[in-house]
Design a protein with these regions (language model features):
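N-terminal interaction/assembly modules
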Residues: 1-81, 101-104, 129-138
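Residue-level detector of well-ordered alpha-helical segments, enriched
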Residues: 15, 19, 85-89, 119
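Short alpha-helical segments used as structural interaction elements across diverse proteins
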Residues: 16, 68, 83, 110, ...
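Short low-polarity hydrophobic stretches
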Residues: 23, 90-91, 116
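Short amphipathic alpha helix immediately N-terminal
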Residues: 82-100
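Helix-turn-helix DNA-binding module
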Residues: 97-115
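DNA major-groove recognition helices of helix-turn-helix
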Residues: 116-134
Length: 138
């Protein structure tokens, strides 16, 4: 998907939410650093046998493109507009990034779904307004 936010066009709520979802997906597809732990002293042949036998089966998703990683970093920079507003950032990440509905996110956070929805909307508005101001100043 081609995003045009870096070309000076105004962002809206839907674009911010879609970018948040893409950033979460990109983060999920990044390779995780694997700590060898207790296996580091084992002979490589034993480790290979364990892996072939199905031990520690890990499904690897397709790696994200470098452009997707750059867009993810840009989205993470947007959280500066939610500085000192952790409750807004959490509601936004759960609903837009993790694609949870307000009811499920509310159950996880222990708040009503309308509160989650209001926090998400306020966070989206703050990001849209903050990015608009940043682009006008540039």
């Amino acid at each position: 998907m081609d995003w045009t936010s870096d070309r000076g066009l105004a962002l809206d709520r839907k674009q911010v939410a879609a970018r948040m979802h893409e950033a979460c997906d990109t983060l999920r597809r990044l390779p995780a650093g694997q700590v060898r732990g207790y296996r580091s002293a084992w002979p490589e042949m034993v480790v290979e046998c364990l892996e072939m036998a199905g031990g520690d089966v890990i499904v690897r998703l397709a790696a994200p493109s470098p452009r997707a990683i750059d867009r993810m970093h840009e989205v993470f920079g947007w959280f500066i507009h939610l500085k000192d507003q952790r409750h807004l950032a959490v509601a936004l990440w759960l609903t837009c990034g993790r694609s949870m509905g307000p009811s499920r996110a509310g159950g996880l956070l222990g708040i009503h779904r309308d509160t989650v929805r209001n926090r998400r909307d306020e966070a989206l508005d703050r990001i849209v307004e903050g990015e608009r101001r940043r682009r006008m100043a540039a």
